[in-house]
């Protein structure tokens, strides 16, 4: 079992234990212990928190060193840094920053704040467009839920109306309930328990 775990192969099945789901992939092999995408420029401080605790907006953008970027003829990813807003900044246009300056400007919470689980500020990468998009999706979901509720209520009322007995059936049931049913002369009044 231990050797199978080290080699990454699945262990032999054990009797009495069901293997319903596949074994989770060991993410420790893919990600280093500190949050650094290993594509950042050398010399930048690595973030102190674990990768699973930070939202994607806090992770470094994939950038190459300036010499490589200049040799390739410009940035490799046309979108630029993830956490930088696309529109003009409220305090006016500013000169474009190098990837190292962008990386240093994006704040990363310290590990105790990230681990505390308390209320956190919005991530610096959350753009106004994304917030509007989230609001639109929320409004669409609410409208869909309201439509489904109205449709359910309409169907329920139709079912009630469809299964309502006719007045003739109500009268028949009333008379049959009031009339004594003919019984055998030896039959008891009531069935014993």
From Swiss-Prot:
Keywords: Apoptosis, Mitochondrion, Phosphoprotein. Disulfide bonds: none annotated. Its main location: mitochondrion. One of its GO terms (biological process) is negative regulation of cell growth. InterPro entries: Bbc3 (IPR031661). It is found in: Mitochondrion. Pfam families: PUMA (PF15826). The keyword Aminoacyl-tRNA synthetase does not apply. Residues 1-31, 71-131 are annotated as: Disordered. A motif (BH3) lies at residues 137-151. Induction: By DNA damage, glucocorticoid treatment, growth factor deprivation and p53. By ER stress in a DDIT3/CHOP-dependent manner. GO terms for cellular component: mitochondrial envelope; mitochondrion. The keyword Iron does not apply. The modification Phosphoserine is found at residue 10. It comes from the Eukaryota. Essential mediator of p53/TP53-dependent and p53/TP53-independent apoptosis. Promotes partial unfolding of BCL2L1 and dissociation of BCL2L1 from p53/TP53, releasing the bound p53/TP53 to induce apoptosis. Regulates ER stress-induced neuronal apoptosis. Interacts with MCL1 and BCL2A1. Interacts with BCL2 and BCL2L1/BCL-XL. Interacts (via BH3 domain) with NOL3 (via CARD domain); this interaction prevents BBC3 association with BCL2 and results in CASP8 activation. Belongs to the Bcl-2 family. The BH3 motif is intrinsically disordered in the absence of a binding partner but folds upon binding. Folds when bound to BCL2L1. Also folds when bound to MCL1. PANTHER family: BCL-2-BINDING COMPONENT 3, BCL-2-BINDING COMPONENT 3, ISOFORMS 3_4. This is Bcl-2-binding component 3. It comes from Mus musculus (Mouse). The gene is Bbc3.
